[in-house]
């Protein structure tokens, strides 16, 4: 197992942009997902829905409807990590370039998250996330 794989503890979430966050929440609740958390950021409304070990982050832009350009887009994948700094070091050591210069923070969940992203070969962001 390589140094990056050793840090990953599981899949964190799948990010789904939406034009109607309320309808999206209702749809996934119909499938049995529970609304786990919501957050309002300056540019987006965000909701996390969970079912067993599956987590979906759905978000709606306040300014631009359909900001990603098409309906049904999966915007990024995210994996849980147990130590964000050690993971960043392992990612850099593997020759991957983080999209931002520093580990970022968002006020999700109870105490927030710290995260960084890299691009896969198709330019899809892969996020590494530590829930605080």
Model-derived regions: residue spans:
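Helix N-cap motif at beta-to-alpha junctions
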Residues: 20-21, 82-85
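Helix-adjacent hinge/juxtasegments
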Residues: 67-80
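Exposed loop/turn and edge beta-strand positions of beta-sandwich/beta-sheet ligand-binding modules
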Residues: 10, 43-45, 73, 109-112
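Core segments of cupin and vicinal oxygen chelate
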Residues: 16-56, 109
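Vicinal oxygen chelate
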Residues: 1-5, 92-132
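N-terminal beta-strand motif that seeds the catalytic metal site of vicinal oxygen chelate
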Residues: 1-22, 74-77, 129-132
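Short amphipathic alpha-helices in soluble, non-transmembrane regions
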Residues: 29-30, 90-94
